[in-house]
Amino acid sequence: MSEHNIRNFSINFGPQHPAAHGVLRLVLELDGEVVERVDPHIGLLHRGTEKLIEHKTYLQATPYFDRLDYVSPMNQEHAFCLAIERLAGIEVPRRAQLIRTLFCEIGRLLSHLLNVTTQAMDVGALTPPLWGFEEREKLMIFYERASGARLHANYFRPGGVHQDLPPALIDDIEAFCDPFLKVVDDLDNLVMANRIFKQRNVDIGIVSVDEAMAWGFSGVMVRGSGIPWDLRKSQPYECYEEMDFDIPVGKNGDTYDRQVIRMEEMRESVKIMRQCCAKLREPSGQGPIASIDGKFAPPPRREMKRSMEALIHHFKLYTEGFHVPEGEVYAAVEAPKGEFGVYLVSDGTNKPYRCKIRAPGFAHLQAMDWMCRGHLLADVSCVLGTLDIVFGEVDR
């Protein structure tokens, strides 16, 4: 018998690949069609965010968080604001907490809609993204009506939110909920019940409970394996302990389970949005939308026209900023992608001494090599899609 040289070959996936979900470069080592090794090359979107934050006041640093997971920006701002509030002992008014909770759930819809529909597109279905983006457009308009910006909102501020919601916007958000659930049902029938989608996703990228814990997974990646871990229930913040909602969990820990969970989470988010709208209309939901301490939030414009002190507070806030007491704190929120955390160290000045960002996508991407081994080349984009990665937060 003649001897044959068997040689694995390496190919590049990305960084311009449409299924790479950003500027990801994977070096794939293949044995025929079977993946032997995956080497993710990150850093192509690195902007030095953590270092830039050290040179800005706390208020000036907030917009940097919009640019991390730019699919659902307000969830990232939330973690930073919570960290500042815990260090400085700022009391957030109830109305501001309800508005934050409402817009965090809108962010969850924005993220899950993008992920589920582009996952369908990666396996060849072109209709779901069109339906999903139609709904995302409506949600973007809610962002715009609240903050003035569709994407980089800079709406959450230490001590509350930037401005109040007009009553008409609350009515429109509530009116959005019922028709949206119909679209989710349609997507369920079109995508989740589809034979081809199931063939491409069932039993692909299986993660057991122990493996999910060992790799530092969070969010849907953990719940897909059957662990009901959700920071909104296990470590409630803002108004989440008042809300009535369930945590969907998977059985098999595969790609398909994780997408089904994202579909269910959209329904749960709509439940929370309805409750927030109802509570915002109640007498207990009225009141200020930012801390009444003039050191942390700007005074109302009518005050500035009358009071010299208010004008001085405003000037000091936007030039020097406020000083946060010395100390360190870790604040985490249940972002759509997983546990997004901010470890904030203050030296008592008006700028953070250090701000470490814990991005869920970073922990998930490191498991790409282990999850893809033994799968076919065509399954790489399915596994990558189910990790739900955005490079703003991975590269920072």
From Swiss-Prot:
Domain of life: Bacteria
Entry annotated with the keyword Transferase: no
KW Cell inner membrane (keyword) present: yes
Keywords: Cell inner membrane, Cell membrane, Membrane, NAD, Quinone, Translocase, Transport, Ubiquinone
UniProt-annotated location(s): Cell inner membrane
PROSITE patterns membership: COMPLEX1_49K
One Pfam family recorded for the sequence: Complex1_49kDa
Record GO cellular component, one term: plasma membrane
Membrane protein topology class: Peripheral membrane protein
Catalytic activity: a quinone + NADH + 5 H(+)(in) = a quinol + NAD(+) + 4 H(+)(out)
Oligomeric form and interacting partners: NDH-1 is composed of 14 different subunits. Subunits NuoB, C, D, E, F, and G constitute the peripheral sector of the complex.
Cited function: NDH-1 shuttles electrons from NADH, via FMN and iron-sulfur (Fe-S) centers, to quinones in the respiratory chain. The immediate electron acceptor for the enzyme in this species is believed to be ubiquinone. Couples the redox reaction to proton translocation (for every two electrons transferred, four hydrogen ions are translocated across the cytoplasmic membrane), and thus conserves the redox energy in a proton gradient.
Family the UniProt entry places it in: Belongs to the complex I 49 kDa subunit family.
Name of the featured protein: NADH-quinone oxidoreductase subunit D
Species annotation: Methylorubrum populi (strain ATCC BAA-705 / NCIMB 13946 / BJ001)
Gene: nuoD
